[in-house]
Amino acid sequence: MSNEIKSISSSNSSCPPNEARSGERDKALSLVLGQIERNFGKGSIMRLGDASKMRVETISTGALTLDLALGGGYPKGRVVEVYGPESSGKTTLTLHAIAEVQKRGGVAAFVDAEHALDPVYAASLGVDIENLLVSQPDTGEMALEIVDQLIRSSAVDLVVVDSVAALTPRSEIEGEMGDHAVGSQARLMSQAMRKITGNIGKSGCTVIFLNQLRLKIGVTYGNPETTTGGNALKFYASVRLDIRRIQTLKRGTEEYGIRAKVKVAKNKVAPPFRIAEFDILFGKGISTLGCLLDMAEETNIVTRKGAWYSYEGDNIGQGRDNTITWLEENSEAKEKIEKLVRQKLTEGSEVSANSMKPLASAARAANTPPVMKKISNAA
């Protein structure tokens, strides 16, 4: 009897070497995670599946077509760059983002390095200019220091810098006209990006940098266009938008707006290289009803046959302008169409950010280990 007890106890005490090694590794991992949290604070390191928010929150751009192209809008807690030629709608696009933030009770700041902000035009786009924080800095260092302090406060939801090209280093301002300061602006931007990026993620503030285009000298093949301020902003930006004017809108001989095309040149939080088009009306900004009509037609909520647009089998307007006028006059139908459009656009978009969880749960259901791809050691 005693021999049987000894054999049972010895078999229970002996564990396979792999399980013993795994237990030691788990214990060591829990110890080091606890040590890191004690040294650097809770939340300094975590498993991705334990995060309270898996999906990146967004700020609406003010254009429904661009929201779709970006996967919801500008991501919170990220750097965004908007660049394009002159009079293409860069400032208008960011003023609409400011208006959207203020509508939701947020705080927005506008760092006007170009000293060209028109408060009357901003108010016509829906910006609450009385509560908008505005700074017109003298130097690039001053502008970026203001941006850094606003981000550190964690009290501002959106900061717009207009523009990177106007962030003049102090050495260039204090020097004489014609002095060469090669790379001074690029060094300034590189240092600023290193300094503010970590604080942006912690505060949840979105920072939008507007940028201008320049031409590279001596480029025969490829695109000669480049943006100012060096390459640092290109790397640190989660989203880069290339905005262009593709058409001038006319009624007879009178010009009343432009048609803008935005290409998502870079996107870390959604699929990139999508394209959005929308109308920008002079004195009014982005045509929200025009965006709604475009998306309703694309999702077959509103159909078009020839010049006639129809909704629920009834003709609502002949031509685009008349249909937009009908949407303005019929607010109930407009709200219903907008609700249907947003439902169509969000179908199937709620997907977990942790791609290993569905794989592991499916494997457990089948009582088989998850299949992992092996990495070949062969050179």
From Swiss-Prot:
Residues 1-14 have a biased composition (Low complexity). The keyword NADP does not apply. Disulfide bonds: none annotated. One of its GO terms (molecular function) is ATP binding. It is found in: Cytoplasm. ATP binds at G84, P85, E86, S87, S88, G89, K90, T91. GO terms for cellular component: cytosol. HAMAP family: RecA. This is Protein RecA. It comes from Prochlorococcus marinus (strain SARG / CCMP1375 / SS120).
